[in-house]
């Protein structure tokens, strides 16, 4: 590429360098991401040890090492002192460890959500603001070569970057969202994931599989008539630590709907998991007399039904769709379309 198209390669390298250097997460965003990683690991341990009647509830050695290493890498100050007091010096149990991580995560979520949702791009990268004047060659919109197209004759090129970028918080991470204007006037929004998750390469292979399945669905008359297709976002790896993910504001994940429901009824998003573990520990007495796998499965079903009634009702998605529709006619049309599909 550098030999055949040196100006194109130079332009792409400059653009990738700006994204990698100028869009690094702040200290608060890094702490929030790592706190979520520690909490997810702790919840897995908590769930796995729920039916063990001989469990002493102590924090695993690996978790102690991880949280100690995390505390050592924090900048000196009140934040590091408070974190060490909560997790290192006090020697918490696994239950206390989970509760304190939840409290720290919630604090950072509130702090990050108070930030302005839109920022000026010139405060972050002056090069991207003047990209249309500083580029040496035309650059195509990222991700178009992932399409199953015969040639690139119809591919769109980057005209310029919009002067504002957005701040996103989703799935335990904070990202920046940049918007690119193409030479045909279309807008493409990309979430800058830095650092990208460790499972992102596996995720990209799944995306490619779904694109192949979409071509199969498109060839079938019944699926094409119903408009059935997988919604596959475009993921473009820039470097081992950076990738661009196509972001469409028209789509909302089930996780976001669930978190909104938990906020409305005043519970934490991890409270159903904690409640399940606590009731399992209080009910499961496998040490007193022998129990079979059938008993264990029945107990799990009973606990799931109880939590479904008290915390997670079966009409969460229905309530969300009812609130977001502009009129009852829109809701009826959506239900009709879903039924036809």
Stretches with model-predicted labels:
Residues 138-340:
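Conserved ATP-binding subdomain of kinase catalytic cores across diverse folds
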